Amino acid sequence: MANEIPTKGILKSEALKQYIMETSAYPREHELLKELRKATVQKYGNLSEMEVPVDEGHFLSMLVKIMNAKNTIEIGVFTGYSLLTTALALPEDGRITAIDIDKEAYEVGLEFIKKAGVDHKINFIHSDGLKALDQLVNDKCEFDFAFADADKSSYVNFHERLLKLVKVGGIIAFDNTLWFGFVAEDEDGVPEHMREYRAALIEFNKKLALDPRVEVSQISIGDGITLCRRLV
């Protein structure tokens, strides 16, 4: 297919990637997450690459636990692998506000979320991300942790809203910020359908690096994830 998504991730050694997955990622993966991953592949084929990889899921789970987060927000849910990962990591009284414009994809994962007994933790908002964030800002909501994995060209606008929603000391995580490694390559070598997000993410990464309101760490896991700790 002309628009087939390249194999996700910035780690180019297939042998090393397989070692990481088979040694620590797959053995620790929750059974319902495994089932959800398989269901996503069955329904979406190559597009299942939009889901976070297993090792990144472990990273997010540990981060939420280390932070003792209780109130989180996720923009961009797809079938809910990262959403279920977070729900399993939160305490019984933890809550997630999940936003996505594609309710059909979310419902693929809802079956497994219910099986895990964590559906009571999730408030799903069927909406465009920016519209939903603006409403949450108006409602003066507050979160400990945010995970953004939606329209990459909207990351700058997501960031401004999330700085109003995530408490001082909280974490905002942006996924895919290294975009298959294309951010470090000349545009001529990048597939045409990947160039728009590449350009948007290059500019976004520059803005984050210069933003005095956050402390930034870019993590080379999955397709690249950038952590922003709110300072002011």
Swiss-Prot record:
One term of GO molecular function: metal ion binding
Mind telling me which GO cellular component terms the entry cites?
Answer: cytosol
Q: Which residues bind substrate?
A: 8, 149
Q: Which CDD domains match?
A: AdoMet_MTases (cd02440)
Q: Name one GO biological process term.
A: methylation
Positions with a binding annotation for a divalent metal cation: 149, 175-176
Q: So what does this thing catalyse?
A: (E)-caffeoyl-CoA + S-adenosyl-L-methionine = (E)-feruloyl-CoA + S-adenosyl-L-homocysteine + H(+)
Q: Which residues bind S-adenosyl-L-methionine?
A: 52, 74, 76-77, 82, 100, 151
As cofactor, the record names: a divalent metal cation
Pathway annotation from the record: Aromatic compound metabolism; phenylpropanoid biosynthesis
The EC designation for this entry is: 2.1.1.104
| PROSITE patterns registered for this protein in UniProt | SAM_OMT_I (PS51682)
**In its keyword annotation, does this UniProt entry include Methyltransferase?**
yes
Task: Name the protein family.
Answer: Belongs to the class I-like SAM-binding methyltransferase superfamily. Cation-dependent O-methyltransferase family. CCoAMT subfamily.
Name the UniProt record assigns to this protein: Putative caffeoyl-CoA O-methyltransferase At1g67980
Species in which this protein is naturally found: Arabidopsis thaliana
